[in-house]
Curated annotation (Swiss-Prot):
Subunit annotation: F-type ATPases have 2 components, CF(1) - the catalytic core - and CF(0) - the membrane proton channel. CF(1) has five subunits: alpha(3), beta(3), gamma(1), delta(1), epsilon(1). CF(0) has three main subunits: a, b and c.
Keywords: ATP synthesis, Cell inner membrane, Cell membrane, CF(1), Hydrogen ion transport, Ion transport, Membrane, Transport
Lineage: Bacteria, Pseudomonadati, Pseudomonadota, Gammaproteobacteria, Alteromonadales
Subcellular location: Cell inner membrane
UniProt keyword Ion transport, yes or no: yes
Originating gene: atpC
Main location: membrane
Family named by the database record: Belongs to the ATPase epsilon chain family.
This protein's name: ATP synthase epsilon chain
The keyword Cell inner membrane is annotated on this UniProt entry: yes
Entries under PANTHER family matching the protein: ATP SYNTHASE DELTA/EPSILON CHAIN, ATP SYNTHASE EPSILON CHAIN, CHLOROPLASTIC
Intrachain disulfide bonds: none
GO CC terms: plasma membrane; proton-transporting ATP synthase complex
Its membrane topology: Peripheral membrane protein
GO molecular function: ATP binding; proton-transporting ATP synthase activity, rotational mechanism
Length: 142
């Protein structure tokens, strides 16, 4: 018996990074973690910077970094429209570590004109990229 699947498109302004049938999609929405399975109720929500975990039709898993964007769930399809999307092998771990360090230092040296929200967004993006890299490293080590 074939597993139930739904069509998934993950796109950014620059490219379409994933298109195909999936058994499950996990992303971080503004209200928390979301697990989208075939037959999910229609939904439109904002997604936070983080990891998209895709369980493909054949049971294999793929992890993608999303910098934030929108998730739309329809009866037969899922669409993720993200500002920036990257496969794990496209992430520069050292650059992400440096961005995290800069954001933390900026927050520690906050002045009167400090934009806390912007610093938190930059920190969240860097940490999300590092989580994707760490997840891939763990999967390779298995």
């Amino acid at each position: 018996m074939a597993a139930m699947t739904v069509h998934l498109d993950i796109v950014s302004a620059e490219n379409s990074i994933f298109k195909g049938r999936v058994a499950c999609l996990q992303v971080t929405g503004v209200e928390g973690e979301l697990g989208i399975l075939p037959g999910h109720a229609p939904l439109l929500t904002t997604i936070k910077p983080g990891m998209a975990r895709i369980i493909k039709q054949d049971g294999s898993e793929e992890v993608i970094y999303l910098s934030g964007g929108f998730l739309e769930v329809q009866p037969n399809s899922i669409a993720v429209l993200a500002d920036v999307v990257m496969r794990a092998d496209e992430i520069d771990e050292q650059a992400a570590l440096e961005a995290k360090r800069r954001a933390e230092a900026h927050m520690a040296d906050a002045g009167a004109d400090f934009d806390y929200d912007a610093a938190m967004v930059e920190l969240a993006k860097a940490m999300a990229q590092l989580r994707v890299v760490e997840t891939i490293k763990k999967n390779i080590a298995r």
